[in-house]
Every structure is written in structure tokens, then in C-alpha cells.
Swiss-Prot record:
GO terms of biological process kind: mRNA processing; positive regulation of mRNA splicing, via spliceosome; RNA splicing
Biased composition (Polar residues): 18-28
Protein name per the record: CUGBP Elav-like family member 4
Family matches, as InterPro entries: CELF3/4/5/6_RRM1, Nucleotide-bd_a/b_plait_sf, RBD_domain_sf, RRM_dom
Residues annotated as domain RRM: 54-135, 141-221, 392-467
Region (Sufficient for RNA-binding and MSE-dependent splicing activity) residue spans: 1-287
Keyword Cytoplasm: yes
Alphabetized GO MF terms: RNA binding
Amino acid sequence: MYIKMATLANGQADNASLSTNGLGSSPGSAGHMNGLSHSPGNPSTIPMKDHDAIKLFIGQIPRNLDEKDLKPLFEEFGKIYELTVLKDRFTGMHKGCAFLTYCERESALKAQSALHEQKTLPGMNRPIQVKPADSESRGDRKLFVGMLNKQQSEDDVRRLFEAFGNIEECTILRGPDGNSKGCAFVKYSSHAEAQAAINALHGSQTMPGASSSLVVKFADTDKERTMRRMQQMAGQMGMFNPMAIPFGAYGAYAQALMQQQAALMASVAQGGYLNPMAAFAAAQMQQMAALNMNGLAAAPMTPTSGGSTPPGITAPAVPSIPSPIGVNGFTGLPPQANGQPAAEAVFANGIHPYPAQSPTAADPLQQAYAGVQQYAGPAYPAAYGQISQAFPQPPPMIPQQQREGPEGCNLFIYHLPQEFGDAELMQMFLPFGFVSFDNPASAQTAIQAMNGFQIGMKRLKVQLKRPKDANRPY
């Protein structure tokens, strides 16, 4: 019996046909692999595998066991087509896992049933893992069928799909009232049969009462459904909008601005006239709120008419609310000479220093406004004073000491975007337990779902935090 085997080391695959009869190599032997001799590759001796053969992932393997050591354990369940121990492509270090493909599908099923979580190899703390690899474990025999006639029964759907192979399951999705939702799941006995049904039926016809043509595709796996839920949740948090990330906190700010604008306009309207300063402030609010609603930082509006507001005044909305004017980490105006912050300088001496970019353009304006006092004071500060009382400063955040879960429950996450904080992390990982998990099962579930999860331009790398006595925590 000849077995195709390969060892992945430094990114290279070494394929050879190995003799398993315990004898040495033939005179024409071309070399050795892992201490075993092999004969020259003869195409007639290369084993063939079933079209629906399953590729198995083997986990919890001692790092001192190679293909030649693992082969006797697995070949009792059938003829092996390929056995590959995974090694680091850079260091050549054994990763403690392997891929195994039998020539026959039944052999893989028997091996999984007999070994998975049933036997612990020497030197390991957990039993061996034998399960379909990710590429095989997806529901590649199970189809989702959409745009069905809601009057169709399971028997009708079976008759539609039975021409392509043996159907193991057929289920129509129904609502609480028992009525069909117009979709179903159909499970074949092999991937090839399911693929044939997709090729023949997807988009081929429109069922009576359906709004579009028939939909036939592979059903999502649990992992894919989890990822979709996470992406939807992350999208609601604004994580995938590159402009919303830095400024998402201003959503409430923008809403407050809109409310304050309405109150301000009502206040000045009661006085029977529109104070120029109040009008400018209201317009400034509207501009900032509109921009913030779109997730963009607001830039102060500069008046263009010569008779309304001095050019140096760029009034923020309310002193009691932090101004969002400051993009990409740049802060606003520096503190003024009289000790008042820049955000309140407009209430102090009336006019900010005007940085003249063009002396010929700026000097006449400065001369024109040199003797102008602050516009009628009461309306502008008074209106803001009334409004700002409704928006008190939030109490200062008291930093809390970081807490850790028990050993084996703490995750270390690489490649986080710089703008991520504890709140964003908690929202992302909350469905799997808590940020520090209280049990290993939740931590492992989070790793499976979130490792490789893409946020913006980066993919998360999530793994168990190493023990405290290790040289580094990750």
C-alpha cells in the first residue's frame, strides 16, 4: 500500500509515496523522508480518493510526533490519501496539529467517531481532536432555498430537488402561525449533489407568487452567522465608517446643538429683534450640528458680510459642552492671555486676535473693528446661559482598576485600531461572555469567532493570554 504524505516546513510541501510494508527501499529508491524509504513515484500506484472525501483536522498532537508516528494510529480506519503535519513556515516548529485525508469518506467518518475527544495522546492534557477542517466543515451539503411558493410543502420541494441526488433532510421554514416563509433547507448526502442542484436550479425559474427567481445556495455555517451578526453590530457602532470612528462620540453633541439652536432662536425672538451676535451663533450651531450628524468634525464658519460679526469671532456653541473643533488630533485655540480658555474667549473681551494672512486684506478690517465694542452683550451670553444650564458637565470618570478572569480565560488581542477603547472592546466581545471571561468555553468561542475579524483595514488576532510566569503575555 502506498500513501501520499507531505510535511509542511518553511512553506514547502514534500510529496512522496511511502512504503508501509516495513521493508527497505527498492534499488531504485529516490530518497528518504522522516526516516522512511519510498519508491519512485509511479502514477499507477498513487492512491485515488472519493470525490466526496473529507479533509480532517487533527488537533492536540504531541509536538514530537511526525507523520510516520501518526500513520499507525489512523490507518486502521482506512486507506490514507494524505497526512500533513503543520509546521511553522519560518522556524519549522511543529504546531501540534495536522491535516488528514482518507481515500474513502466512510474512513474519515469512522476515524472521527472513534477518536474525537475519545483518546488522549501521551504528554497531552486534552483528548485528540478529529473533525472536518474548516473548508470541509461548512454546510457544503446543506442548501438554502429561497423565493419558494408559500403554498409548497416539503414533498413539493423534495420532488424539485430529488433529481440531483439523495436528499437526507428537507425542511420548510415556518413562522409562529405555521405558515411558510417561502424558504427551505435541503440537505444532500454529498457536496457534489448539492453543487449540481445549485448549478441547475439557481435563478432558473420564478415560482408562482414569488417576487423574483429561485434562490439556491449553500447554507451559512454557525461561524458565518456569528460573523454576520458581529459585522451588523459593529456597523451600528460606526466601526466601519472611517470618518465616524474619531467623531462618533459627537452624535449626542450634535443633537444637543440642534436643540440649543431652537431654544436660542426662540429666546431672541421674544425680544422682538434678532441680535447679530445671536444670529451668528445660531447659524454656527446649525453648521456644526449638520456636519457632526454626518460624522465629520465641524469647522468654524467665518462670516463674509461686512456688517454682522467681527472676523475674529468663531464662537463655539456652549461653554459647558466640549467643542469638537479639532481634527485628527489637533486641538482648538490656545488659552487666552487673560486666563480664560479659548472656548469662552468670545465672552471675554469680545474680539479674538485676528491672524492676518494677507496684510492688505486684514489691516482695513482690523482698523474698521478697532473701536467696536462687543455686540450688545446681554442677548448672546444670556441666551447661552439659560441653555447651558440644561446641559451640565458630566461627572468626571473615575478610572477603575483592570480586572482579570481566572487562568485560561483572558485574551490578548493584536492589531486593534488606535481609536479603540475599553467600551468598543466590550461591545465587540460581549456576546461571548465578558471582556475577561469567567470560563474557558466562552474564551474559546470568542477566539473562534473573532480571530481574523476585520475592522477597517486591520484583522484582529485573538488568542489566549499566556500564563503569568511566561516571558511575555502574548
